[in-house]
């Protein structure tokens, strides 16, 4: 029974699928039929009718015939073939030959797609032909007007174009022939070729118009402005030489001649209508001439700089030499009281050597200025280097003088530090005396002796002649560590002794009742009398905490309260 239901369901499913699939295939046939009808109704005949309004000769006639034949072939042959294929597809569906029907429908769709492209191309080409004719007709009149204006300008202002006028005349005459060529092609129905003539003519007239705008300006530059600037440079150069400027390194006469030759090249380019090249040459010439002006101006500025800086540098070097002598005397005096490191002495000798070299260089420059055989720009460069080196040497000299002055300051600071550490040591001893300890532990006594020895070492270093400040600083560091360590140990020892004593006193209340407490406290007292305060505190705390946990915390709290009241 179950198997029968399965067979029944499968059969029903197959019937439903077959029905749905056939329906889908028929919808595809309807879609392709509609596409075919749409293609047949395209307005190709109307578009071709527009072509008949043109001159039906030459190229236009050939194109029209080709488009008409293409359209006739589509309507009379290709679309009827599509119709037959659609009928074939329907017959295949009726016979349930779905695979063959699907393949045929795919072929029909591909064919319609190709026909769609062919129809689109016909319409596009027709519109292009008609559009080019309309556009060319409008543009040719604009070009005629532009050509007339150019001819008129050339005639009226011929002198402003120089030798280029003849070639411009030739080019405009050649352009005029293109108008006749356009008319002939249009008359012959060759509208696309006529369109090419319009585009070529438009480009040529654009170039000629641009040239006619640029040529007068370029001729003005090459015939008037640039030669005048070169003449001005030549006059300025001669005048500066007469005033004593050394300008041989500029090679001005040769350079000016090169610029004149470049101007001649530019004029030849203008004559040949190589306008873009001529514009580039003129731009380069302007930059190069500006650079020549800058060179002459730099010489004038350099002359002013040399005249101003020479006296100033002379005074600077004299002042520096005087300061160096003072520093030398100061260094000799300081050496009697302080030890100078070899590097410091070498630095001073280097400063002296640099000063002599700078003075020598200055005198050489001074001689060259007097000889008047060196360009001021070169002298300026040397003086700028000299100024930079003088500033550097002044900085090094000032650092050395500061170091000498610092030595005395460092000594005073070292003595102040020594006094401070002595006070710290005295304060530690005062605390010990105030605490009335029965005695001092041996480790503490050794630390105390070490602190005193370190302070004596610093004092001895400060009495040495010459004074070696690095050695003093080293001794100070060692003394500082020893004194600080002793002071901390003092505070710790007094605290341990006081707490040990108070803990023993607190534990006395349990001494009679608890033999163990009595024994622990007696041992703590023994350690206290033998100056072992740390161990005495540990022993006393252990004994008391045995019978009263937290007792040491209460002892500490009471001691801290007493300290607060005393302070």
Swiss-Prot record:
Its main location: membrane. GO terms for cellular component: plasma membrane; septin ring. GO terms for biological process: division septum assembly; septin ring assembly. It is found in: Cell membrane. Residues 1-2 are extracellular. Keywords: Cell cycle, Cell division, Cell membrane, Coiled coil, Membrane, Septation, Transmembrane, Transmembrane helix. It comes from the Bacteria. The chain crosses the membrane at residues 3-21. Signal peptide: none annotated. The keyword Transmembrane applies. Residues 22-567 are cytoplasmic. It is a single-pass membrane protein. Residues 98-159, 251-497 form a coiled coil. Negative regulator of FtsZ ring formation; modulates the frequency and position of FtsZ ring formation. Inhibits FtsZ ring formation at polar sites. Interacts either with FtsZ or with one of its binding partners to promote depolymerization. HAMAP family: EzrA. Belongs to the EzrA family. This is Septation ring formation regulator EzrA. The lineage of its organism: Bacteria, Bacillati, Bacillota, Bacilli, Bacillales.
């Amino acid at each position: 029974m179950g198997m029968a239901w399965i067979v029944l369901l499968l059969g029903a499913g197959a019937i439903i699928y077959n029905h749905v699939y056939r329906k889908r295939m028929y919808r595809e046939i309807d879609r392709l039929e509609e596409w075919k009808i749409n293609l047949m109704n395209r307005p190709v005949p109307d578009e071709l009718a527009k072509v008949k309004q043109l001159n039906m000769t030459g190229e236009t006639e050939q194109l029209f015939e080709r488009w008409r034949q293409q359209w006739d072939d589509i309507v009379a042959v290709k679309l009827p073939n599509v119709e037959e294929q659609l009928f074939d597809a329907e017959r295949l569906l009726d016979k349930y030959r779905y695979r063959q029907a699907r393949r045929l429908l795919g072929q029909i769709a591909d064919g319609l797609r190709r026909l769609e492209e062919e129809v689109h191309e016909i319409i596009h080409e027709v519109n292009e032909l008609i559009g080019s004719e309309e556009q060319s007709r409008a543009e040719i009149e604009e070009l005629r007007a532009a050509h007339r204006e150019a001819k008129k300008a050339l005639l009226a202002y011929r002198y402003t174009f120089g030798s280029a006028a003849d070639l411009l005349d030739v080019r405009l005459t050649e352009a005029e022939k293109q108008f006749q060529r356009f008319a002939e092609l249009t008359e012959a129905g060759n509208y696309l070729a006529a369109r090419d003539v319009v585009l070529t003519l438009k480009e040529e007239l654009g170039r000629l118009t641009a040239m006619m705008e640029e040529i007068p300006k370029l001729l003005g530059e090459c015939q008037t402005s640039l030669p005048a600037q070169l003449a001005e440079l030549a006059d300025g150069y001669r005048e500066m030489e007469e005033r004593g400027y050394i300008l041989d390194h500029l090679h001005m006469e040769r350079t000016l001649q090169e610029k004149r030759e470049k101007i001649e090249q530019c004029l030849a380019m203008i004559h040949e209508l190589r306008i873009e090249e001529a514009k580039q040459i003129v731009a380069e010439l302007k930059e190069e001439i500006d650079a020549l002006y800058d060179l002459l101006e730099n010489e004038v500025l350099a002359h002013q700089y040399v005249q101003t800086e020479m006296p100033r540098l002379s005074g600077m070097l004299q002042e520096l030499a005087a300061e160096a002598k003072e520093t030398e005397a100061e260094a000799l005096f300081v050496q009697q009281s302080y030890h100078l490191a070899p590097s410091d002495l070498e630095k001073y000798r280097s400063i002296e050597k640099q000063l002599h070299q700078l003075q020598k260089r200055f005198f050489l420059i001074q001689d060259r200025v007097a000889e008047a055989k060196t360009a001021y720009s070169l002298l300026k460069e040397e003086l700028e280097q000299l100024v930079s080196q003088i500033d550097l040497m002044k900085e090094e000299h000032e650092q050395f003088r500061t170091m000498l002055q610092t030595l005395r300051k460092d000594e005073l600071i070292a003595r102040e530090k020594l006094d401070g550490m002595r006070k710290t040591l005295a304060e530690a001893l005062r605390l010990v005396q105030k605490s009335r300890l029965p005695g001092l532990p041996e480790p503490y006594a050794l630390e105390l002796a070490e602190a005193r020895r370190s302070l004596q070492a610093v004092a001895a270093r400060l009495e040495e002649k010459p004074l070696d400040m690095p050695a003093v600083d080293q001794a100070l560091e060692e003394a500082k560590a020893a004194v600080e360590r002793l002071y901390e140990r003092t505070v710790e020892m007094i605290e341990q002794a006081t707490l040990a004593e108070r803990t023993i006193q607190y534990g006395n209340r349990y001494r009679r009742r608890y033999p163990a407490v009595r024994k622990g406290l007696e041992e703590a007292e023994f350690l206290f009398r033998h100056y072992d305060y740390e161990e005495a505190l540990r022993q006393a705390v252990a004994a008391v905490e045995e019978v009263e946990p937290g007792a040491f915390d209460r002892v500490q709290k009471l001691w801290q309260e007493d300290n607060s009241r005393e302070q």
